[in-house]
């Protein structure tokens, strides 16, 4: 579900809901290799030594970086940000944040030139940020695995693998559940990044 929720066309997350509620395992098969046993999705599983069980990526994202000193102390900052998106009928995919900054990740196909100009102007007016910039043509890579909870250094291994290939990270986000890590990179580096991560976690 983490891979689907991240916006990648692996499996629609709502398709799992009936099976999840009834505690029914689901098997995903490969149409190009129907005799392969496939992937079993269950409500619980035994965590083996491998910390990562899946890697997926998708293109067509843009990120908007907003920075403002003492942003975390400003009441209603997040609400005003979301109101700007709502007024322009824009949905966001991810919103990683720090103490003084926040990044909005959107699907690029929502952003015509007119919409983008209006969005940036309204964010500037409503939020009065110290810095506001948009980055286009991003790919998002998601790695998932319940074993990441017990394994120290998965993030370090991932970033080291990307660094060896001279792949710059535009953004990184890890949820508090510790079962997934998302990386944002330039789309032209997507294939190289996927191969580097596969070599790191599935080298055998």
List each language-model region with its residue ranges.
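C-terminal catalytic "cap/lid" subdomain
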Residues: 1-176, 180-204
